[in-house]
Structures are given as C-alpha cells and as structure tokens.
A protein has these predicted regions:
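A conserved ligand/cofactor-binding region detector
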Residues: 1-325
Length: 325
C-alpha cells in the first residue's frame, strides 16, 4: 500500500515525505488512549461495528518552550491548523445538565477506516465560559476542590452524552422494550473515568423511560464491560460524596441505591462484613468507582493476562471469590 500511495501522490505532484513535517497533536500517548485506538483500528479492520466516544479537548498536554534558558509549559492548541478529519454534527448536539448549570455537548465525528468505516465521536462542551472549561484541557489540575469538580464534570459530560444517544437511538428503532438492548449493545468502559456512565444509564432508564430500578440495574449488568488499567489501590478512582451531591445529586442517589442492592446480594451470598466493606460502592462518605464497575460489569479484565490474574488474585480477590464467572 505504501508504494501505491507514493505513486498516487506523485501523480499529483506531492512528495509523501511532506507528511513528516506535520506536527503530532499532543493529546497523550498513554496506555488508555493506545488501547482505545487499538480497539477502534482492529474492529474496523475486522469489519466489526464498534464506535468510540470521548471528549474533544481544545488543548493537548502542553507545548514546550524555552525562556531565558528555562522550560516553560504553554497551552498546545492542536486545532490551530484546522481539523480536516472531524465532522461537526450540529444536528445531534444535546444538553447535559449539572445542578448548577447546563452544557451543550456538540459531537465531532472522525472516521475509522478498515473493512468497514466505524466512528470516533468526540464531544465538545459549549455554552458559557464556565461550561467550555469542561473540554478545554486534557488533564486539568485536580489538587483543589474546583479542579476535582472539573474532573468529575468531564467524566459525566461525555458519559451522559454517550448514554443518552445510545438509548434514544434504541428507542427510535425498537420502542421502549429494553429487553433486547443488551443483545445489541456492549458498552466497554476503558478504566474508571467513564464508570459514572453506569449510574447515568440507570438514571435515564428509571427517570426518562420509566423502568423499575431493579430492571434498569439488571440491564446495566448485562450491558457493561470493564477494563482495569492499574493494580495500585491508591490509583483507583473514588469521589467524596460532597462533590457528587453538589453537582450531580441524582447520580449520588443512584450510586447509594446500587450499593444497597449490592450489599443485600452479598449478604445473601454469605459474605462477611469485612468482605462487604472491601466491595463497597459507597462507604465512609465515599463512592468507589472501581467497585461499582466490578459489581455491575458482565466482564472484567486487565490489559494483559498477567494483569488480569493480579486483579483476580489480589486487587479484586474478594469480588472474584463471590462472582467468579
């Protein structure tokens, strides 16, 4: 294919080496993004229907510069030369509501080519200056309350936009009989950042589509899958209840209710108080997102076989004992 591409470009008077001059967008190259990109590339190459969702950040990691012999970090506007690969879908924008303000999520679609063309959909936050901060920086500082709330807003923003789209599209095609939803969809959670999507899935099913809570939880447990990216307990995401209640009170209520269901189930299974505490989704005024993912997801894995074994035998050993399947 390389030679064919060179030949086609040469016919147009273009040297393929000019592509070496294109700056890479500084949007990160860690394990999370690499695995997501591999998922998308592989699925398109195999002809499988798989679409990705995320945030369309205005700025990347940072732009390095030197001033008086010292490094300074400047915002990296990766879109300064335009973004020819993304298509803005103004017709599919939607509102995402927080307790204190509402944000408009505008999708931008990027094609992923293979045996079929799949889609990477990235949401851009628009509205007030405050709202637009949600999609401004890739990794905002979270050493302050304001920074922590911004991280939480980011996670809910794209998760809520994604779940709302999936459910709306399903209802348009199949009506409000959600029994076949898990047969037609798998929602893959890439680490704990989008795990709040579980609570939003249940919230929409109960509040908007009038499904019983038990039914919504059952559908979630048949739909979601979770890939863990860290074996360090201190790196697993958790949120103090004050933050969640402040901007997402309905989500806080859903999380508490899921925890009650989980505790009842685990008590009936003969778990000790210590085991239940280790698997708690809500405990000591804190929400534990990894425990939520492990309880709800129909499958849990690491990024490698050894990683998965560590999850089974160490990090989530108690949960694996109760839910070995």
């Amino acid at each position: 294919m390389l030679n064919e591409t060179k030949s086609i470009l040469a016919e147009k008077g273009v040297d393929i080496n000019v592509f070496e001059e294109i700056e890479d967008a500084a949007l990160g190259n860690g394990g999370l993004g690499r695995l997501a990109a591999c998922f998308l590339d592989s699925a398109a190459g195999l002809g499988l229907p798989l679409h990705g969702y995320g945030i369309r950040y205005k700025y990347g990691l940072f732009k390095q510069a030197l001033e008086n012999g010292c490094q300074v970090e400047l915002p990296d506007d990766w879109q300064r030369f335009g973004d020819p690969w993304s298509l803005r879908r103004e017709d599919e924008k939607r509102e995402i509501k927080f307790a204190d303000y509402t944000v408009t999520a505008v999708p931008y679609d990027m094609p992923v080519f293979g045996k079929r063309i799949n889609r990477l959909r990235l949401f851009q936050a628009e509205g007030s200056e405050q709202a637009e901060k949600i999609s401004e920086y890739l990794y905002p500082a979270d050493d302050t309350e304001e920074g922590k709330l911004l991280r939480l807003r980011q996670e809910y923003f794209f998760s809520a936009a994604t779940i709302a789209e999936l459910l709306e599209n399903y209802v348009k095609q199949h009506g409000r009989n959600f029994g076949t939803f898990p047969k037609l969809h798998v929602i893959q959670l890439n680490d704990t950042h989008p795990v709040i999507a579980i609570a939003e899935f249940i919230r929409l099913l109960t509040a908007k589509y009038r499904q019983p809570f038990a039914t919504a939880l059952s559908l979630a447990r048949q739909t979601f899958a979770y890939t863990n990216h860290t074996v360090l307990p201190e790196a697993l995401e958790c949120w103090h209840e004050d933050y969640v209640k402040k901007i997402l009170p309905d989500i806080a209520d859903i999380l508490v209710k899921i925890n009650i269901y989980a505790m009842r189930e685990q008590t009936a299974a003969g778990c000790t108080e210590e085991e239940i505490a280790k698997m708690a989704i809500y405990n000591d005024k804190t929400f534990f997102m990894a425990n939520l993912a492990v309880y709800v997801a129909k499958s849990v894995n690491g990024v490698a076989k050894l990683h998965t074994e560590i999850l089974k035998n160490s990090l989530f050993a108690t949960a694996h004992k109760i839910y070995p399947e």
